[in-house]
Amino acid sequence: MSLWVPPPKPPTKLGVYRRLSTTAGVHVSPLQLGAGSIGDKWSKFMGSMDKESSFKLLDAYFDAGGNFIDTANSYQDETSEKFIGEWAEARGIRDQLFIATKFSFDYKRGDNTVTQHILYMGNSHKSMHLSVKASLEKLRTTYIDLLYLHCWDFETSIEEVMRSLHTLVLSGKVLYLGISNTPAWVVSQANQYARDHALTPFVIYQGAWNVMDRDFEREIIPMARYQGMALAPWNALAGGKFRTDAEEERRRITGEQGRKLGPTWERNEKERIVSAALEKVAKEVGTNQVTAVALAYLLHKAPFVFPIIGGRKVEHLLGNIEALDISLSEAQMKELESVVDFDLGFPGRMIGNGSSHGPLMRSAGHLEPPLLLQPHRQSKLN
């Protein structure tokens, strides 16, 4: 009898793990559970969940094979990290999870006992120290798997940021580093500084990206490809605005509505057009989950893509997992991209973005496509 018996078949493809990036060998679920809704302090802003419903969603994700949870020091005025920490401790599964959290924002915004907030904000060594200390306590853990710089502050130097982050890695309090909501040139400079000085570089970039809003593709994706970084799209489902006309009407009738991150919960014309295209492709691939198609689109665009799926309902989570079973044709990808204009801008319009040869190179001869790492091929779980 072999010692190397394969494990049981995972309940869903959340349990078919992928290497995080070419620069990080840890294996994680292909879809992250976004914890922006987990916690009970943001009901007026984007919805919130009590502890029982939070634990139920976390249970559903973990029991489906998921191990990659994304939170932040400031989410739900700190209750997101607190609920996750309490849940993981109660289940005794901390080391089975890959937990990402973030610093930069004022996580004491909702704390009335704090009168001076400036030292809790930004990317300084002081802010970083306070935030990580608090996150470890709230998450009830001795280490953070992935720490993101949440937002570039244009105040703290690259040198201070990278040296301060490296001390956290050396201390064992943080294992991997990520960066979010930051210009591509800053990330490139920061990683080059890290390499030049034997410091820990960033291995993943988190930013806004979906089939409707593709600014991410201009500078961020080419930068990540060159740096060997993974991509973690937030706003992958346009803040919940990708839905069918029938679903929107149902919400209107029942009064359920949806998130109000903008002036209204209802979709605008652009969101309706993209939703219709997603619904058409969904029918072609045999699913009624337009959100799953939107996620599958991102997974088909580049390697090492780990979309963040939020929400508060277990049924929505399970519907989104269907994205891992969807294989989109090149024609379907082009159809989804055709409904909203997208321009690479300068200089991409002139030279391309590295994923294919630009007009200047094509004018000189017939060329084989560039040799690039390809996205994972989606397939059914056997």
For each feature predicted by the language model, list its residue ranges:
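Active-site beta-loop-alpha junctions enriched in small/polar residues
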Residues: 36-38, 74, 102-106, 149-152, ...
